[in-house]
């Protein structure tokens, strides 16, 4: 474990020559090690000789919804940069220039229906066959090469996951890496540090509506006095994001509390009911953003195990069957209507995440400019368990987006080619991943 800086180490004066604050700065309190976002004060104003400011990092966030999306609602009917958005992509219209939608792509020889979700980031062939052994996943490939640069080499997250059976993250020897499903556990890992007693004390404070920011308020005030105006705004934005997430995690449990007097017993910060699927997804998106914003990790995978989800809560929309059952709609209009509502909710959550990433500024870019978001599924059509023509959305990361890259829907283009492009954008020298044949054709860096 990396050592935690002393409290006094954050009290460096801000001077005109911009002596750089350490990129590994923390605000430290009892049970707290709060990472700082990137500040301009962390880079010297003048490079001396061969010295250069550290490069702004690039990140990767891969998300798989293992029940996919209704193809006729997701894929645009037209192609190129002038494509007409599909009904689902209309929900992302504010971000049209920040994403590329793909059709006609898949993992060669990855079949088997539902078991293919384990291969979404590995592209290992024939997952449903006897004796199948998985291979390294994209997130772990990245972690092996640059994971030492951050506190956490990678984060492997999940929502309603069938633990022990499903995961996006796999080691080089084909061993499943279990997902972290509780937002509170992820929050602990990111922001709480100290003895077990100190950590539990902070958790109790969160449950009572208090903030981890209270423990470092004095240091935060001192730091803000000694940085530039832009950095003060940046810190205010970051601290607000942390507090809003704390409040959301607390509020998400309110509906599950029985109508009786409040007690001092510990209450989980995150919803435990699988029905609260969408709120869990939103919490994971928020945590991923904060993890990237603080450079706590640069590689995150998130499996949305819709197969393992029951009848989920969807605001005012009433669902009559479990998510998985709805996906086998058999062209039932009633089931399709409910699936559309679920899918559109997913699109709105993605839109919200992209909005938040665009709000965060980092050395002249936005956090979205520096973060590749891969959203897709192992199934092209969950109704028939088809594993070709996968719905793939790729956003951010500093690419020339705003297009529909359409390939042959019968003879698919290899999706692993996109993985090679992503690796190269991460600064990793690689010209091959799994069954790739090169980089993604038609996708250019900005």
Locate predicted features.
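Ligand-binding pockets and gating/stacking loops
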Residues: 2-446
């Amino acid at each position: 474990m990396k050592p935690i800086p002393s409290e006094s180490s954050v009290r460096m004066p801000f001077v005109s020559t911009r002596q750089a604050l350490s990129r590994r700065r923390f605000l430290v309190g009892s049970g707290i090690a709060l990472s700082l976002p990137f500040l301009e004060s962390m880079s010297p104003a003048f490079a001396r000789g061969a010295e250069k400011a550290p490069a702004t990092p690039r990140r990767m966030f891969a998300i798989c919804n293992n029940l996919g999306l209704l193809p006729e609602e997701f894929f645009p009917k037209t192609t190129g940069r002038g494509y007409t958005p599909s009904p689902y992509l209309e929900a992302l219209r504010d971000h049209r220039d920040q994403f590329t939608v793909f059709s006609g792509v898949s993992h060669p020889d990855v079949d088997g229906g539902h078991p293919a979700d384990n291969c979404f980031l590995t592209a290992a062939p024939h997952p449903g066959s006897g004796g199948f052994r998985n291979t390294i996943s994209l997130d772990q490939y990245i972690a092996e090469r640059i994971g030492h640069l951050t506190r956490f080499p990678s984060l492997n997250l999940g929502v309603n996951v069938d633990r022990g059976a499903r995961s996006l993250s796999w080691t080089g020897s084909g061993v499943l890496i279990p997902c972290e499903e509780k937002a509170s556990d992820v929050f602990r890992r990111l922001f709480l540090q100290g003895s077990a007693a100190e950590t539990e004390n902070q958790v109790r404070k969160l449950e009572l509506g208090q903030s981890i920011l209270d423990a470092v308020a004095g240091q935060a005030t001192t730091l803000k006095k000694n940085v530039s105006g832009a950095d003060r705004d940046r810190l205010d934005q970051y601290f607000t994001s942390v507090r809003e997430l704390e409040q959301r995690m607390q509020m998400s449990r309110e509906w599950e509390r029985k109508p009786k007097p409040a007690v001092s017993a510990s209450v989980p910060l995150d919803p435990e009911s699988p029905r609260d699927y969408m709120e869990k997804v939103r919490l994971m998106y928020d945590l991923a953003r904060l993890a990237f914003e603080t450079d706590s990790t640069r590689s995150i995978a998130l499996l949305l195990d819709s197969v393992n989800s029951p009848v989920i809560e969807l605001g005012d929309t009433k669902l009559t069957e479990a998510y998985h059952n709805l996906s086998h709609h058999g062209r039932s209009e009633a089931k399709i209507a409910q699936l559309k509502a679920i899918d559109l909710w997913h699109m709105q959550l993605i839109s919200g995440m992209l909005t938040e990433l665009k709000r965060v500024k980092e050395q002249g870019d936005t956090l979205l400019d520096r973060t590749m978001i891969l959203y897709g599924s192992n199934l092209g059509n969950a109704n028939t368990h088809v594993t070709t023509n996968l719905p793939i959305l790729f956003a951010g990361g500093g690419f020339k987006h705003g297009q529909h890259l359409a390939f042959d829907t019968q003879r698919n283009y290899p999706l692993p080619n996109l993985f090679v492009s992503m690796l190269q954008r991460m600064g990793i020298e690689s010209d091959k991943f799994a069954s790739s044949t090169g980089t993604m054709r038609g996708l250019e860096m900005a």
